[in-house]
Regions:
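Charge-enriched, short contiguous segments at helix-coil
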Residues: 51-58, 62-103
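Charged, alpha-helical scaffolding/interaction elements associated with membrane systems
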Residues: 2-3, 42, 66
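Short, solvent-exposed segments of well-ordered alpha helices
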Residues: 3-7, 47, 69
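Short, charged amphipathic alpha-helical segments flanked by flexible coils
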Residues: 22-59
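Extended interfacial segments that mediate partner engagement and assembly in macromolecular machines
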Residues: 1-37
Length: 103
């Protein structure tokens, strides 16, 4: 973000979400929208997050198909959401296993 690579930020976050969906069971080769729907259906994206996910989908489409660079605020929003989703999916899953396993 400090080098103003806002398009790159949007695209890498999009790619990360694709990888997460496939790692969690989505079929590889589907559309980005299908990956996001899969994450919703599996409960990784909750109803309050749905609007934000749709915004990321639209932003990702713009970054992919338009030469106009996204602004800093938009890229930061996508990055923040992606980071938090990774924490929820992976860190919380790990922590849950640590504290709920019977000893």
């Amino acid at each position: 973000m400090t080098v103003n690579a806002f398009t790159s930020c949007e695209l890498i976050c999009r790619k990360i979400l694709m990888h997460v969906a496939v790692e969690k069971g989505a079929k590889e080769g589907d559309t980005f929208a299908t990956y996001l729907s899969y994450l919703e259906e599996q409960g990784f994206v909750t109803p309050p997050m749905k609007g934000w996910v749709d915004l990321i989908r639209r932003h990702g489409n713009n970054a992919t198909h338009s030469l106009e660079s996204p602004d800093k605020k938009r890229a930061e929003s996508t990055l923040m959401f992606t980071a938090e989703l990774l924490r929820l999916i992976y860190e919380m899953e790990y922590m849950s296993k640590q504290y709920t396993e019977e000893t």
